[in-house]
Each structure stands twice: as C-alpha cells, then as structure tokens.
Amino acid sequence: MAQETAPPCGPVSRGDSPIIEKMEKRTCALCPEGHEWSQIYFSPSGNIVAHENCLLYSSGLVECETLDLRNTIRNFDVKSVKKEIWRGRRLKCSFCNKGGATVGCDLWFCKKSYHYVCAKKDQAILQVDGNHGTYKLFCPEHSPEQEEATESADDPSMKKKRGKNKRLSSGPPAQPKTMKCSNAKRHMTEEPHGHTDAAVKSPFLKKCQEAGLLTELFEHILENMDSVHGRLVDETASESDYEGIETLLFDCGLFKDTLRKFQEVIKSKACEWEERQRQMKQQLEALADLQQSLCSFQENGDLDCSSSTSGSLLPPEDHQVRSQESPEVQAGSGDSL
C-alpha cells in the first residue's frame, strides 16, 4: 500500500517542449519507517511499480540528467524503466533461475544476473560511490576486497544515489569509495610478464585441450564479448565494461592489429571498386561501339532493301519462264488471281 503524497505523474508540456514523464515516489504504509523496502516508485500511465533498490542497481538503468537537490526523490523516467524491464525479460536470475534479472555482476566478463532480493540471499556485495553516485553489485565469486567503502547487501541503512552524469542528486558529498576490484585487475596487468607467459605456455593450453576445456573457455570469452558489445551499443555499459575493453584492446595490442587489418580491408575494397569501375567503363565503351555498329548495319540494310524492290522479286529462272509465256496465259493467270 502506498500513501498518496505526490501529484499525478504524466508527460507535461511547456509550450512546444514536452517534459519527460518520471516515476513517482511513494512510501509503503505498512513497512517500518526507514526500511529499505518502503521506498517504491510507480507510473500511473504505464502501470509500473518498482522498488527503489531494484531501480538503482539495475545494470541498464540510470537516472535522468535533471537533479532535484531539495529532496531525495530519484529521477527515473518511465521510458527508461520500460526499456530496462524489456531487457530483463531475456535475463535469468543466477539464484532463482527466473526471468527479469536486471541486476548484473559489475565485472565485465561475469555473466551472473540477479533480482535484487536474490542478490541479497546469495550474499552479493554492494558498492556505492558517493562522489559519483554509482551503484555496483558483485557476485560472491567476484567479491572485491572489503574496505570501509564496501557494504553488504544486507545493510538496510545504506543511502543510494545514482545519476546519469555521475553526480549526487541530494545530500552532502560522501567520501569516495574505492573500487578494489578495479585495483585488483590493474594489479594483475602490472604483474611481471613471466607469470602471464607461464600461464599461457603451449603445454598448459594442450592440457586444457585434452581436458576439453579450451573450446569452453573460448566460447565463454566470445559470449562475454557479445554481452559487453550489446551493452556498449545500448549505452548501458558499466565502468568495468569499459575498463575490460580497454585492457583487452590496448594492453595486448589487439586494437593496433585490428586497426591495421581493417585498413588493409578498406584499401583492398577500394582497389576492387576502382577495378570494377574500370571494367564497367570498358563495358560502357563497348556498348557504345556496338550501338554505333548496329546503327550503321541498319542504314546499309535499308539501302539494300530499297534497291531490291525496284527489280523483280522472282528468281532469274522463273523470270525467263514467265517472259516466254503468251500474253493470253499471262492474262489468264492474272484473272485467276
């Protein structure tokens, strides 16, 4: 049950500029005061109701750019919420195996997705960056080292702020909460190359192949890359997604190699296009020459036809027989016609 504490929500226009419809905030009348589940948002026009935490931690959802510093009402526009609900229909929860799991592990290569309540049950770790207004969740398998910035998913007193421009929507600025997971990833990339080289030596990969793991590994990598690519296209990629792509592209030289090959492909296609254009030009010239020859042939044919019509159409032998016939026979044959 929700208390009616806000005016009806809907698209309002000021002149010719329509205002984006936002979700309305309500407080459940049956929940204890200050309880994390008491804050809900709904859209009368879209018939949508959602918990504040479910909105804040959904991987593909951010608040509107317009920030209200006078209160704690979040700025979720209805269109973005509908889009996130649609995206969640394809995602199954790693805990309950049901659809609608929009809260994903923030590591770019992890495929786990949750409902917010299922993430709590699975002992997931939440991280809040007060300065940037970001909300991140890590599955138990990829839980970062806990500092004072890391809070458990079971902590109901945690204040949550999220903004598209990475700004606070209300309250004084909080101290930045360090992402230990990102630090750990950087630490991995900064380790001596000997360790990395030892992990990818031929005998190790051969053992993976013998165990049937190599194909599974590469399929998993491709699936993760496809997932990250989808989030980049949808503009829902997280900070970890960008960091993972940056590491993949630049640290191993993949971007440089891909750029070089792409340039070679473009140059090759340009050469093929120029050759094709040259061939088409030759074909046009040949067709023009053929057209000229055809016109010349038709002119010569007309002259032959006119000259032949001035003489007899009968063969020479028939003409001789015809000339030897008597006038009466010729006249009779003419009458019979």
From Swiss-Prot:
PROSITE patterns the record matches: EPHD
Residues in C2HC pre-PHD-type zinc fingers: 25-61
Comp. bias (Basic and acidic residues): 187-196
ZnF segments: PHD-type: 91-143
Composition skew (Polar residues), residue ranges: 301-312, 323-337
Single annotated GO MF: zinc ion binding
Chain's role: Positive regulator of Th1-type cytokine gene expression.
Protein name stated in the entry: PHD finger protein 11
Gene label: Phf11
